[in-house]
Amino acid sequence: MDTLARVKKILRDTLNLGDRAEKLTAESPLLGGLPEFDSMAVVTVVTMIEDDLGVTIEDDELSADVFATVGSLAEFVSQKAAA
């Protein structure tokens, strides 16, 4: 499964998006774009990414830019997995 697909699956499961997750693209906005994507969802998504990839994400690595779009989050996840 590629990184974008993994991120979409995590978002689908975390935010209970159901079939709406299939419409997400790399350009789909997260912050301000999905009402379900609030501060608690950010924490849950980060935890699921850490568990899924076996990585640790430090607080200072996170910014609004990481969560701007599905693609920006997937790029961040890809970089963490490669490190």
Regions found by a protein language model. Name each.
Residues 1-37, 41-46, 51-52, 56-83:
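Phosphopantetheine-dependent thiolation modules in NRPS/PKS and related acyl-activating systems
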